[in-house]
Amino acid sequence: AYLRKPYDTLKVYNSALNMCKYYFKCDELAQIPNEKGKIKNKFRRSNSAAILAARPNLINGGIQFFNLDKNKEALDFFATYVDIAINPMFEKENLLQTDTVLPQIAYYASLAAAKMEDYPSVLKYAPYAKEDKEVGKYAMEFISTALKAQGDTVKWIASLKDGIQKYPEHSFFFGHLIDYYSNNNKFDEAMQFADDMLA
């Protein structure tokens, strides 16, 4: 009967987020060997089950904050969702391969980060979305933009070339690469790249 009463959804989402962070820290500390060199992590199974049960609320919380244009909070939720997939607590679940929603959530994490110009977070989360049919090209666009903003020209150019190879119909990569070549009078490199593309 108590479930029929209204409740504060943001509090529920924040509780799920805080629980995940708390259990991550508990697990990290439980993995430290004792004085005999043994690791006794007796709460890992129950904590990981609780995190997996709360994980959908991370998506909901991220979406709610994203829609409120609170990108910092949205990133926190989306990033934690992705971080669960790469946390050692969940090795057996193989979430990077089995979670079909993860690439989209990684995309939203990188989008929220990009809106704040948090380029380290863009570079951490966007790669998980690169292969997605719907959002992969945009994730690669975020990566390129972040690399350029950080002043890493070599990696930026490489990311543009990767983007052209993977998503040739998406004009962002080609346009920026041609702009780079023409603005820096690198016409020979531009011709060589065009020849390589045609080969």
Model-identified regions with their sequence ranges:
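Short coil turns that delineate tetratricopeptide repeat
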Residues: Q31, I86, K133-V135, P168-E169, ...
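Residue at a conserved register position within TPR or TPR-like alpha-solenoid repeats
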Residues: F65, A106, A113, A146-L147, ...
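Short coil/linker segments at helix-helix boundaries
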Residues: A1-A106, P120
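Canonical positions in the second alpha-helix
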Residues: C26, Y81, Y128-A129, D162-G163, ...
